[in-house]
Design a protein with these regions (language model features):
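Extended, low-polarity transmembrane helix blocks
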Residues: 1-37, 58-66, 70, 77-153
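Membrane-interface interhelical connector segments
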Residues: 38-59
Length: 153
């Protein structure tokens, strides 16, 4: 089954870049998800979200942990990458709106990091994981971009 989006064919160089991007972004998201688990767990994260005025804080906390930790693992593997990318973008849009919108720089509690993470999620949603991925191995992504050479008469 091919995914409806993130199904762009890639060149070998693009595959390497996508792998590096997936590993980097996945590691950042796993670290943020693990931080939530390690520093208060679901209950503590929900309490923190409620204190920040995030609606449906327990559900939002469960989603945040799942999409950061679980989504990070999936993206490192290159599995369901376009779907996770869209969910990350939505998650980061919520973080920007509810928590970080009053400043730009991270040092000021601003949105620069969540903006970049969300944008990179959209890039992965649009491009897919590349050929070095579970998505490719399972046939959810196009083979490659090379076109047959023209034959001269």
């Amino acid at each position: 089954m091919k995914l409806a989006f993130g199904n762009r064919p890639t060149t070998p160089a693009q595959d390497v870049v996508l792998l590096i991007a997936r590993l980097a972004l996945g590691a950042v998201m796993i670290a943020h998800g693990w931080q939530k688990v390690d520093q208060g767990g679901l209950g503590g994260t929900a309490d923190g979200f409620e204190a920040m005025g995030i609606p449906l804080a327990p559900a939002a906390a469960a989603f945040a942990i799942a999409i950061e930790l679980g989504g990070g693992v999936l993206v490192v593997l290159g599995a369901l990458t376009p779907i996770v990318g869209v969910l990350w973008a939505l998650h980061m849009a919520g973080a920007l709106w509810f928590v970080h919108r009053d400043a730009f720089f991270v040092a000021d509690g601003g949105y620069e990091l969540v903006l970049v993470l969300g944008a990179l999620g959209l890039v992965l949603a649009a491009t897919g994981a590349g050929r070095g991925s579970v998505d490719h191995l399972l046939g959810r992504q196009s083979e490659d971009v090379r076109q047959p050479e023209a034959v001269s008469a």
